[in-house]
A protein has these predicted regions:
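Active-site helical microenvironments for divalent-metal-assisted chemistry
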Residues: 1-177
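Short, amphipathic alpha-helical interaction segments embedded in low-complexity terminal/linker regions
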Residues: 175-218
Length: 218
């Protein structure tokens, strides 16, 4: 079962509507920008996160990409949500500088690594394997992980988030060959549900990620 936006609580609905208004006509590729925000929220849901992290998922780009100010976020949604949003807001003249700025703020507010992982995972999963965006994320990944990998390192849920992102960005991370033989056999036989279950078992992932892995295998 996918993430159901109809089940958001009042505070998250407020955050979603606020972001929808703030981003206006902005696009995420060919799609309305809310598509990306919903994808980030869905990744958090896959790992059981909600509350302030859920609110921050909808709001994480409003300070960086719209006229909304940090003060507005704090006044409307509180200090913790602002701290999460501000930590992942990159400030600087170019991408490298913005990344470094965000890394330093996330290190100072470690809980924000959960939000940043969800954001990067959603971006990577939305990028075709051979696209320039995927190439950029793969190039950045060693530095990204060197800065943020030590944060909340003892948290098993955060570790699983890293595993999901690593699988997406590192082509060398894959299921053992014998498992792929069985998965490919099931796909060839038209046993999609069984192939999906085999991918979930091999990668210890949810149905959404398993569908992406199968789609790339096709």
């Amino acid at each position: 079962m996918g993430f159901d936006q109809q089940q958001l609580d009042q505070r998250e609905n407020e955050a979603r509507e606020f972001a929808l208004t703030a981003h206006g006509d902005q696009r995420y590729g060919e799609h309305p920008y809310i598509t990306h925000l919903a994808a980030v929220r869905a990744v958090l849901d896959d790992f059981g996160y909600a509350g302030e992290l859920g609110q921050a998922a909808w709001l994480h780009d409003v300070v960086e990409d719209t006229p909304v100010t940090a003060e507005e976020i704090e006044n409307r949604f509180g200090r913790e949500v602002l701290d999460l949003v501000w930590a992942v807001t990159g400030v600087g003249p170019d991408r490298k500088a913005r990344n470094q700025n965000a890394y330093s703020k996330i290190v100072a507010h470690p809980r924000a690594v959960i939000l940043k992982l969800a954001d990067r995972t959603a971006n990577a999963e939305a990028s075709p394997p051979n696209s320039s965006w995927m190439g950029m994320y793969r190039t950045e990944h060693p530095t990204f992980k060197a800065h943020l990998g030590p944060l909340l390192a003892e948290d098993p849920t955060v570790a699983r988030m890293w595993e999901r992102l690593d699988r997406r960005l590192d082509p060398a991370v894959a299921a053992p060959a014998d498992q792929w033989v069985e998965i490919d056999r099931l796909v060839a036989a038209g046993e999609h549900d069984k192939a999906l279950a085999a991918v979930r078992a091999a990668f210890e992932c949810g149905p959404g990620e398993a569908e992406l892995i199968l789609a790339e295998r096709a």
